[in-house]
């Protein structure tokens, strides 16, 4: 097993109400006001109250092409990435020189050398640290990242590993895209980063770390779903692909996947005492609640995160994990009880991670 020793999250520096963002977005993508009513209706339906952005609202109209946006992704992503990793290491009682393995994920910008490579001198990482940058997992990458770091630590029980997520979704804005997918996505996504520090079993015992234990994980790809979520990448950057059938796939498959996965560990859905679910959006959260027959309030932390920050892609589920561990608006889980962390993303796919609090 592996142990979660620290979790930290951060959001973009510029906070706006959903109403402010809606009004500004409408001016950019529909300057003549033809789509203003539908933009307002769809963005209001997200149930989001606030979002934090990487840049001031006025900067987006003059951002220019993909190159300029990606430059901002690297600049701001490095600042956010450094802050969350240092905070998570501090929680764990560790320093940069203690880190043996770093996995970094983002689907909202590109960097070569990758972000974690550029952060090495800032964080004080050793030159022999193992690095695994990831692109393409999207919203599922927070859960999948914890699962893959866990896999690594099973084979390296004395090691310290860091998972970094940086998602600056607003920088992918396509001002000429009046598609329903772009209107919906622009009303959902916010900007943020998160880091998780995990340690192997022997390292946890030696340091006396008693955080949540990662017990097991399950990855699942769903047939004939490649076209329902992702990017159409072209000269202008990342153009959103997003189908209304996402919630239908969740309804069709999630309950059987969760039931089988938990059954392999002698558990049932009703045994899970704390759910750590990616936010998605209202339709996604409703689909999860209905398919798993969850009681009102069991995804309260996810709903609150969605309202306060929007969907932060891969960072969302990590922010929710942090909120639960810190008892933000929710009772901290009792030691020894089971929890399930889950997320979905492009593929279309899901990742389930069994925790013991």
Model-derived segments and spans:
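Acidic-glycine-rich active-site phosphate/pyrophosphate-binding loop
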Residues: 110-125, 164-175, 226-231, 285-299
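Short beta-strand segments
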Residues: 6-8, 105, 135, 160-167, ...
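Claisen-condensing/thiolase-fold acyl-transfer catalytic domains that form or cleave C-C bonds
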Residues: 82, 107-108, 121, 126-128, ...
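Condensing-enzyme catalytic core mediating Claisen C-C bond formation in acyl metabolism
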Residues: 1-75, 175-252, 256-260, 344, ...
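Short, well-ordered amphipathic alpha-helical segments that serve as non-catalytic structural scaffolds
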Residues: 76-92, 115, 193, 249-264, ...
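Conserved beta-ketoacyl condensing-enzyme motif
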Residues: 40, 46-136, 269-285
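Phosphate/pyrophosphate-binding loops at sites that engage ATP/ADP/AMP, CoA/4′-phosphopantetheine
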Residues: 84-99, 205-207, 256-273, 292, ...
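Short acidic, glycine/serine/threonine-rich loops at helix termini
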Residues: 15-16, 113-117, 144-147, 172-178, ...
């Amino acid at each position: 097993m592996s142990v979660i020793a620290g979790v930290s999250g951060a959001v973009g520096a510029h906070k706006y109400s959903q109403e402010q963002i809606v009004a500004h977005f409408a001016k950019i993508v529909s300057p003549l006001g033809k789509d203003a009513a539908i933009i307002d209706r769809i963005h209001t339906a997200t149930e989001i109250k606030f979002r934090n952005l990487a840049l001031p609202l006025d900067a987006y109209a003059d951002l220019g092409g993909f190159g300029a946006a990606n430059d901002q992704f690297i600049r701001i992503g490095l600042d956010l990435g450094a802050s969350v990793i240092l905070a998570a290491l501090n929680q764990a009682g560790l320093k940069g020189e203690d880190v043996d393995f770093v996995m970094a994920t983002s689907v909202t910008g590109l960097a070569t050398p990758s972000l974690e490579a550029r952060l090495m001198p800032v964080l004080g990482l050793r030159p022999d640290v193992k690095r695994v940058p990831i692109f393409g997992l999207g919203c599922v990458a927070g859960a999948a990242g914890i699962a893959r770091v866990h896999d690594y630590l099973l084979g390296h029980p004395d090691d310290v590993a860091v998972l970094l997520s940086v998602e600056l979704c607003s920088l992918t804005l396509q001002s000429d895209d009046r598609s329903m997918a772009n209107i919906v996505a622009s009303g959902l996504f916010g900007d943020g980063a998160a880091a998780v520090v995990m340690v192997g079993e022997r390292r946890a015992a030696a340091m006396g770390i008693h955080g949540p234990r990662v017990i097991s994980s399950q990855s699942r790809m769903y047939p004939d779903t490649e076209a329902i979520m992702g990017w159409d990448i072209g000269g202008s950057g990342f153009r959103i692909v997003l189908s209304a059938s996402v919630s239908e796939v969740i309804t069709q498959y999630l309950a059987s996947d969760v039931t089988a996965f938990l059954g392999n560990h002698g558990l049932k859905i009703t045994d899970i005492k704390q759910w750590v679910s990616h936010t998605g959006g209202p339709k996604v959260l409703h689909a999860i609640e209905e398919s798993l027959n969850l009681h009102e309030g069991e995804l309260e932390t996810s709903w609150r995160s969605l309202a306060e920050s929007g969907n932060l892609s891969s960072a969302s589920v990590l922010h929710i994990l942090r909120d639960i561990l810190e008892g933000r608006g929710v009772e901290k889980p009792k030691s020894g009880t089971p929890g399930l962390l889950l997320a979905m993303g492009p593929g279309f796919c899901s990742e389930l991670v069994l925790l013991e609090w």
